Amino acid sequence: PLRRQRQMCIRDRLFTIGEVVVHSYGVFVTLGLLAAVVSFLWELKRRDDSFWIGVDILLLMISAGLLGAKLFHVLFSLSDYQEGPHTILSLIFSGWSAAGGLLGSLLALVIYFRKKGLDGWYWMDTLIPSVPLAQTIMRVGCLMTGCCYGKPTHLPWAITFTKSTVAPLGVPLHPTQAYHLAANLLIYLFLTIRKKRSAFPGELTLAYVLFYTIQRSVIDVFRADPGRLWLWDTITTYQLIGTIAVIVVIFLYRSRMRTVS
């Protein structure tokens, strides 16, 4: 029954600076990045690694991640930025793609590690636990904004948005934002526990890619937001990429295990 479902009255726009709107999503993106920075620097200290290499990695990861996240969002949401010049400035504070940010960061870091001759697997394992921590916090912004919303449902834990510029109003929906949040939190906890006894350099990175792509592909089944591309009216691009990623991860995992043994 509807009375048992969660009513979500959100605050998407926190305040404005002139014509620039500061969105709650942008604030939680910032908080997520700050948490990732603190987590990564703490891990650097624990491993007694080079601080300045860590700073290079952080700056590259954040800049490439933000660029990738923004480009992916704009690519799939061009109509959102055709109202006038002020919407270009609002790009800074709203509209991001988690998958785009992940791909942008990974690509930039692979190039950096090869150029510097660093052990990419080792450094990625140092960095990777901070990524799902950031994503967990960022998903709070998704929930407040109403983006990444789910399909209609009458399950007891459905949520109903009463104020949103993105999600349908007055309709009980799957809380897919909360699904993502919980999944990312579990991934973070697993990596945090596993990092002290990983079997080989790169295991944490491969585990993250595996679990992230699986949770994203599964939760995509329950999502209804339009910011996704469908292939053959059957699967989303994320599900296709996720399937390929799982195959690649399994191959790399077996290869790394043979190298260690």
Show where each model-derived region lies.
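Active-site beta-strand/loop microenvironment that shapes enzyme catalytic pockets
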Residues: 65-67, 71, 122-155, 161, ...
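Single conserved hydrophobic/aromatic residue that forms the stacking wall/gate
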Residues: 1-6, 10
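Helix-hairpin-helix/helix-loop-helix acidic hairpins
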Residues: 103-130, 188-196
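Membrane-interface loop-to-helix entry segments
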Residues: 20-36, 89-108, 168-189, 236-246
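Internal alpha-helical transmembrane segments of multi-pass membrane proteins
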Residues: 49-56, 120-129, 196-209
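Membrane-interface capping segments at transmembrane-helix boundaries
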Residues: 42-46, 117, 196-198, 252-261
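Gly/Gly-Pro- and Ser/Thr-rich, intrinsically disordered tail segments characteristic of DNA damage-repair
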Residues: 11-83
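Interfacial helix-loop-helix junctions of multi-pass membrane proteins
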Residues: 17, 73-87, 145-160, 218-239
